[in-house]
Swiss-Prot record:
GO MF annotation terms: [acyl-carrier-protein] phosphodiesterase activity
Catalytic class of the enzyme: hydrolase
UniProt-listed GO biological process terms: fatty acid biosynthetic process
Catalyses which reaction(s): holo-[ACP] + H2O = apo-[ACP] + (R)-4'-phosphopantetheine + H(+)
Protein task: Converts holo-ACP to apo-ACP by hydrolytic cleavage of the phosphopantetheine prosthetic group from ACP.
Pfam family, one: ACP_PD
Enzyme Commission code(s) on record: 3.1.4.14
Protein name: Acyl carrier protein phosphodiesterase
Native source organism of the sequence: Escherichia coli O139:H28 (strain E24377A / ETEC)
Keyword tags: Fatty acid biosynthesis, Fatty acid metabolism, Hydrolase, Lipid biosynthesis, Lipid metabolism
Entry similarity comment: Belongs to the AcpH family.
Length: 193
């Protein structure tokens, strides 16, 4: 899962949106650095990452990547799941329009920015103003996201080419998303994530 899915599942679970978004920017034990609700959100994010990576649908999708891009498949798939969530938001969350959800999420996250790591602050400078969560529905934007990650981290250069794997397996990936994401939504709503 990437930013949008983590925020969405956190909302459904009544967990800290801030902690769920912050988690990738925190190493080790967050308990001494953040309030309990944010810590709980960080832990939820980590559980979701482990759960998602081990879902049969996700493991199968990783195998569809070519040998030269398979190493970055988990990252590429995380971004792609956000694409499908953004694209199908009105079906998955009909009572909370995506643009309203993005404003709500931003308000929640802004409360922790003063005490956040610089890389997280930097992300927030772009995430909200450039409407990333809404733009995830556009595959051209997904390609830009993958290229941007590859540019910032040379060891992840294969992300540029992983775009072709997404394109080649788009329909099958969308089918897998519909197989697992509604289950995760139900788990979140029952606070079972």
């Amino acid at each position: 899962m990437n930013f949008l899915a983590h925020l969405h599942l956190a909302h459904l679970a009544e967990s800290s949106l801030s902690g769920n978004l912050l988690a990738d920017f925190v190493r080790g034990n967050p308990e001494e650095s953040f309030p309990p609700d944010v810590v709980a959100g960080i832990h939820m994010h980590r559980r979701i990452d482990v759960l998602t990576d081990n879902l049969p649908e996700v493991r199968e999708a990783r195998e569809w990547f070519r040998s030269e891009t398979r190493r970055v498949a988990p990252i590429t798939l995380d971004v792609m799941w956000d694409h499908f969530l953004s694209r199908h938001w009105s079906q998955l969350s009909p009572d909370f329009p995506l643009q309203e959800f993005v404003c709500y999420a931003r308000e929640q996250v802004m409360t922790i920015l003063p005490d956040s790591p610089p890389r997280f602050i930097n992300l927030n400078n772009y995430l909200w103003s450039e409407q990333w969560l809404v733009r995830y529905r556009d595959m051209d934007f997904i390609q830009n996201v993958l290229n941007g990650m590859a540019s910032r981290r040379p060891r992840l250069d294969a992300l540029r080419d992983s775009w072709y794997d997404l394109d080649a397996h788009y329909d099958a990936l969308e089918t897998r998303f519909w197989q697992f994401y509604p289950r995760m939504m139900a788990q979140a709503s029952h606070k079972a994530l």
